[in-house]
Amino acid sequence: MKEKDLKLIQGDSFYLTLNKLDKEGNEIGFVEGEEIVFSAKKNLKQPEYDIYSDKMTLTEEGKIILYLSPVDTNIKLGTYYYDIQYKTLNKDIYTLVKGELEVVWEVTDE
């Protein structure tokens, strides 16, 4: 599991491409039926998510593109805690990455 902080603009679309690697660091690709979930909370103890998305696209190369819509990212400015979880075909769950998510302001509101 890796730690990485992210920054996104409030109310904007956000895409993140994920690669699947084996233990030696070689890219092996995701397969149909595997799942990725992005979730974020302002407070780790709160029961509800501020962002929750399982919207993803599997590319021909075996990469997953995770998508957060403008509705997903239209939350209060500030720092949140996030993680990205991976669910295997066997329903095992692994946290791939976690960190702080900073939601920053925007000027144009469309």
Annotate each predicted stretch with a short phrase.
Residues 1-110:
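Contiguous segments within soluble domain cores/interaction surfaces
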